[in-house]
Amino acid sequence: MSTNSFPLLQTVNDPADLRRMSRAQLKELAAELRAFVLDSVSKTGGHLSSNLGTVELTVALHTVFDTPRDRLVWDVGHQTYPHKILTGRRDRMPTLRQLGGLSGFPQRTESEYDTFGTAHSSTSISAALGMAMAARQRGEDRRAVAIIGDGAMTAGMAFEALNNAGVADANLLVILNDNDMSISPPVGALNRYLAQLMSGQFYAAAKNVGKTVLGPVPPLLELAKRFEQQAKGMVLPATLFEKFGFNYIGPIDGHDLDSLIPTLENIKGLKGPQFLHVVTKKGQGYKLAEADPVAYHGPGKFDPSVGLTKPATPPKQTFTQVFGQWLCDMAAQDDRLVGITPAMREGSGMVEFEKRFPGRYYDVGIAEQHAVTFAAGMACEGVKPVVAIYSTFLQRAYDQLIHDVALQNLPVVFALDRAGLVGADGATHAGAYDIPFVRCIPNMSIACPADERECRQLLSTAYAQDHPVAVRYPRGSGAGVAPLPGLEGLPFGKGEVRRTGQRIAILAFGTLLYPALQAGETLDATVANMRWAKPLDTALLLEIAAGHDALVTVEEGAVLGGAGSAVCEALNAAGIQKPVLQLGLPDVFIEHGDPARLLALQGLDAEGLVRSITARFGPAAG
């Protein structure tokens, strides 16, 4: 679309421009903003459904609150494209999630309107509460607002923050963006019911004592399902959130500016913790996304007039798909197997497993700590848990990994998806640290398959062990080596030599084996596929060290404490002095961009490996 398609939006350079518009103009602006988001994401790829669902809420927040003086903290942050567009970044949207371009998440270094960096869920209430308390301590009269989804609200961290906020009595507004409930007809019925309730004697009595009691509604009951179920439609003297010390308001239609703006204006004048429940619809305004918000959660480039289409040529099998197929095959063979995921069914490749084995599939919600200890409890009883989790999210359950699984030496398999660089999602989602943080834990092992075939084999190896094992693999596809049928594993803790050369030996951990092999051809170097960061194949290492002048370790993970460090430790323990060049991800957070380009910038493609090795050890002999 041309800029002429968005005449009002083109006049908005910062939120102050919204505050000069009439209500009718704001509605027109919201329509343009939604169309702009759709047009933009269709050209760059990115998160779509969630952003289409927050258009009116974003317009209302920036209209009512004095941003950036008033702080907005967006939980997870993948719903912030409208926020970015309205805060001076409209013309940079073509660079979204590209190297050097806009982040797909809030980023403090990108804009003063991004008050807190988010990407992992359920952090917003804690951060906003901290900001509210800091404002109080400094004598500043400003508001802090946390916008959190119904999924993120299920995490324990969110409830910990609510508990603290109620006691602190801070000037904090928590907005529950509930997009798990249809707007029509339920909200129409709710609005009628609430209109009757608010005009009745019960509401008047509640108001006299300073309480706003709007009664339980289905999303609230769903959110509080761990608490005693209450009869639908029953008016309670206090909601769950009021028990936490909040004044609960809602639910209201999150797509209706005539409801949102007056409600937010009223709340702005209230002191103490406030809780506003808004109901939105993922994909709002784009029928294809409304019908299938999961498919349009994070699409690539597409034609909005056609929608998502299957590629002309079938894509290569991804590591996620390899895992999903292995999980189903192993479950068919062993009825002790159960699959556990913290709300990542699609992303972790467990859709088919849920269909085929519904009684053995456990989605515990956004609750990584619980997921790990839940698996530990099952393992205690002879069940064989497989926890499918992104590498970056396992960080959230580190104490449980150590205390509840490893300390008790329980046989839990951790399928670590998105290991290494993830590309467009950037530093917040990179799985850079799993090798260092897993290999230092007693009883834990970690495997690094080089390709799709090895991924299936090493998952079987991990499953056969009587102690906890993690198998790390990257996003997307690898070298394209088709997995073998059957469930045979590879030897535990053993690597292999893939190329025999002279003078220099390259020890590759994981999918960087293939650029290492290319570099090995150029340098006439020996190349080993080490497969395991722990236990390290010490026998193979010492054999290689004895026959070469220098060693190079290569891994798509943090160099500090990584597999290269394990090699150096093993050589030192054996009393062997040999120069070792450790190549991997440096001690910096690597931003978003094309994964292949990012690896090349870190010198982890074949050409980069040759450059680094030559710079350290000189050119290949002869």
Curated annotation (Swiss-Prot):
Pathway: Metabolic intermediate biosynthesis; 1-deoxy-D-xylulose 5-phosphate biosynthesis; 1-deoxy-D-xylulose 5-phosphate from D-glyceraldehyde 3-phosphate and pyruvate: step 1/1. Binds 1 Mg(2+) ion per subunit. Binds 1 thiamine pyrophosphate per subunit. Thiamine diphosphate binds at residues 78, 119-121, 151-152, 179, 286, 368. Pfam families: DXP_synthase_N, Transket_pyr, Transketolase_C. One of its GO terms (cellular component) is cytosol. Mg(2+) binds at residues 150, 179. CDD domains: TPP_DXS, TPP_PYR_DXS_TK_like. GO terms for molecular function: 1-deoxy-D-xylulose-5-phosphate synthase activity; magnesium ion binding; thiamine pyrophosphate binding. Its cofactor is Mg(2+); thiamine diphosphate. Its EC number is 2.2.1.7. Gene3D superfamilies: 3.40.50.920, 3.40.50.970. Keywords: Isoprene biosynthesis, Magnesium, Metal-binding, Thiamine biosynthesis, Thiamine pyrophosphate, Transferase. GO terms for biological process: 1-deoxy-D-xylulose 5-phosphate biosynthetic process; isopentenyl diphosphate biosynthetic process, methylerythritol 4-phosphate pathway; terpenoid biosynthetic process; thiamine biosynthetic process. It catalyses: D-glyceraldehyde 3-phosphate + pyruvate + H(+) = 1-deoxy-D-xylulose 5-phosphate + CO2. Signal peptide: none annotated. Catalyzes the acyloin condensation reaction between C atoms 2 and 3 of pyruvate and glyceraldehyde 3-phosphate to yield 1-deoxy-D-xylulose-5-phosphate (DXP). Belongs to the transketolase family. DXPS subfamily. PANTHER family: 1-D-DEOXYXYLULOSE 5-PHOSPHATE SYNTHASE-RELATED, 1-DEOXY-D-XYLULOSE-5-PHOSPHATE SYNTHASE, CHLOROPLASTIC. NCBIfam families: dxs, PRK05444.2-2. Homodimer. This is 1-deoxy-D-xylulose-5-phosphate synthase. It comes from Paracidovorax citrulli (strain AAC00-1). The gene is dxs.
